[in-house]
Amino acid sequence: MEQLFVDDPAFASSMSSLEADIFSGAGQLPSSPWLDLDLDDDVQDLSMAPTTANAVSSGYGSGGSGSHRKLSHNAYERDRRKQLNELYSSLRALLPDADHTKKLSIPTTVSRVLKYIPELQKQVENLERKKKELTTTSTTNCKPGVLGSQLMSEGMAPIVSATCINDMEIMVQVSLLSNVAGSVLPLSKCIKVLENEGLHFISSSTSSGFGNRTFYSIHLQRSEGTINEECPAFCERLEKVVRNKAKL
């Protein structure tokens, strides 16, 4: 059998060509299809892995962005409440001194302010009415420049008006000639007279009006010893005391 293949010329020719193909590469083995793989692509794919991990990590980082927004919102809300508290504190400071003994709640502050505003409006209306009456009296009964000499010659007391703002507060208005205000009844003396009647001084203001007149506006608070006295009667007594004091 072996002799048959050896003697067969076709078989010998095919074997010779196969051996030639095998050994024609000077000892090199035939190339394998696996050797055509591009290793650079594999390395590039591996280098992309951290980027993918970072992308995943950034996905989890969106939760951090939400936390940042929450912190910003909390800081904004804290500042807003602080500003509101400062505004309410300023509003409480405008209330009478009796309301400053303790820190009022926000609803109580608003309630007190809503009650206090009409009282102030009433006070302004009374002052405007008094001023109008004084101006009308000055222009009707006397000529400019004559009223001062008439008051000084006759020894007339200044015009005094006391008004109850509420159960605890009183506003006293005094009108007198400007050229005698400093000697007859200066503001400091007028305040001292009122304090001697059991009142606590809160604030005051002065202004000059028509007819060479000076106006005092004095805001006072009643003490505990004067609360039992009816406000209209108490105001009337204050007016008399101030007028009598101005005659000294």
Curated annotation (Swiss-Prot):
Limits of the bHLH domain: 68-120
Keywords: Activator, DNA-binding, Ethylene signaling pathway, Iron, Nucleus, Stress response, Transcription, Transcription regulation
InterPro entries, per the entry: bHLH_dom, HLH_DNA-bd_sf, MASH1/Ascl1a-like
Motif Nuclear localization signal: positions: 68-75
GO cellular component entries: RNA polymerase II transcription regulator complex
Alphabetical list of PROSITE patterns matching this protein: BHLH
Signal peptide from the UniProt entry: none
Chain positions covered by the region annotation Helix-loop-helix motif: 82-120
GO molecular function annotations of the record: DNA-binding transcription factor activity; DNA-binding transcription factor activity, RNA polymerase II-specific; protein dimerization activity; RNA polymerase II transcription regulatory region sequence-specific DNA binding
Biological processes annotated in GO: ethylene-activated signaling pathway; positive regulation of DNA-templated transcription; positive regulation of siderophore biosynthetic process; regulation of DNA-templated transcription; regulation of ethylene-activated signaling pathway; response to arsenic-containing substance; response to cadmium ion; response to iron ion starvation
Gene3D superfamilies, per database record: Helix-loop-helix DNA-binding domain
Family, as annotated: Belongs to the bHLH protein family.
Designated name of the protein: Protein IRON-RELATED TRANSCRIPTION FACTOR 2
